[in-house]
UniProtKB/Swiss-Prot annotation:
It is found in: Mitochondrion inner membrane. One of its GO terms (molecular function) is coenzyme A transmembrane transporter activity. It comes from Arabidopsis thaliana (Mouse-ear cress). This is Mitochondrial carrier protein CoAc2. Signal peptide: none annotated. Solcar repeats lie at residues 15-101, 111-210, 217-308. The chain crosses the membrane at residues 10-30, 73-93, 117-137, 185-205, 223-243, 281-301. Belongs to the mitochondrial carrier (TC 2.A.29) family. PROSITE patterns: SOLCAR. It is a multi-pass membrane protein. Expressed throughout the plant. The gene is COAC2. GO terms for cellular component: mitochondrial inner membrane; mitochondrion. GO terms for biological process: mitochondrial coenzyme A transmembrane transport. It holds the Pfam family Mito_carr.
């Protein structure tokens, strides 16, 4: 009993923002790892690994399993988790901070989906800027394929491109292209994350408004709202994600086939012209399969973490009272 009270005392001494940071980070890491195999295949589809696109999802799973083993499904996941933990924590914190800043800075602002659209968009952009180099490294590592004579998998020449891990990829990219190289493809990322993050929050809040009051706290309904919001946001912004991936692996691809793509719009139109508009949605079906379990796992883990960390629920009446007090200060 005393031990339990002491444990609760330690947990209660942790600042609320730190609890939210921990909960968000753990949630991001677990959810991302759970869907890592689908993420790997999606990246291979997006970056024109034709030998995988031809055989589809099931064939790609079999091929990776035979040529690279179980760990092949998690190639690049270390960098992905290293990115998603701070990204998820920062994204959540930034969203709350931007939301409060808008409410307190502009007291007459009406609460609703539009507020979440703006706060979510800026939070997404902030998180991307701080964690983008890790996303770049994750993509480069996931793009690499170990060759096999038996299965005729086209591999990148080992002596030219293969990175030995996260640190090696970071250092080589920096030596070859400087800090600018670590942000190759960040423009389409920002173009995509601003509407995606904003639309995700917008759709989620808009759908929640139509949920009957007695079901507001129903986890299954929150899960459905979050999944649909994620799917809608992904569909509308997916072409920019494809452009980002191809820009990220541009140098690796050109080592096998001479090709240079420069700006975001140049890349987008060149993909459409040479490979067809269909390529801009390559891997989208896999992304649909990835988003739903990712959101489901995210909701579950986040709720469990908040429960263990004794994070109090965010009560709108209390928030409204704080806003009212702030408005009086401004006036």
């Amino acid at each position: 009993m005393a031990e339990g009270e002491e444990k609760n005392g330690i947990i209660d001494s942790i600042p609320l923002f730190a609890k939210e940071l921990i909960a968000g980070g753990v949630t991001g890491g677990i959810a991302k790892t759970a869907v890592a195999p689908l993420e790997r295949i999606k990246i291979l589809f997006q970056t024109r690994r034709d030998e995988f696109k031809r055989i589809g999802l099931v064939g790609s799973i079999n091929k990776i399993g035979k040529t690279e083993g179980l760990m092949g499904f998690y190639r690049g996941n270390g960098a992905s988790v290293a990115r998603i933990v701070p990204y998820a924590a920062l994204h959540y914190m930034a969203y709350e901070e931007y939301r409060r800043w808008i409410i307190f800075g502009f007291p007459d602002t009406t609460r609703g989906p539009l507020l979440d659209l703006v706060a979510g968009s800026f939070a997404g952009g902030t998180a991307v800027l701080f964690t983008y180099p890790l996303d770049l490294v994750r993509t480069k590592l996931a793009y690499q394929v170990v060759g096999s004579a038996k299965t005729q998998v086209k591999a990148i020449p080992v002596e030219q491109i293969i990175y030995r891990g996260i640190v090696d990829c970071f250092s080589r990219t920096y030596r070859e292209s400087g800090a600018r190289g670590l942000y190759r493809g960040v423009a389409p990322s920002l173009y995509g994350i601003f509407p995606y993050a904003g639309l995700k929050f917008y759709f989620y809040e808009e759908m929640k408004r139509h949920v009957p009051p007695e079901h507001k706290q129903d986890i299954s309904l929150k899960l459905v709202c979050g999944s649909v919001a994620g799917l809608l946001g992904q569909t509308l912004t997916y072409p920019l994600d494809v452009v980002r991936r191809q820009m990220q692996v541009e140098r690796l691809y050109s080592a096998v086939k001479e090709e240079t793509r420069r700006g975001t719009m140049q890349t987008l139109f060149k993909i459409a012209r040479e490979e067809g508009w269909k390529q801009l949605f390559s891997g989208l079906s896999i992304n649909y399969l990835k988003v739903v379990p990712s959101v489901a796992i995210g909701f579950t883990v986040y709720d469990i973490m908040k429960l263990h960390l004794r994070v109090p629920p965010r009560e709108e009446p209390e928030a409204e009272a704080v806003t009212t007090r702030k408005r009086k200060v401004f006036t």
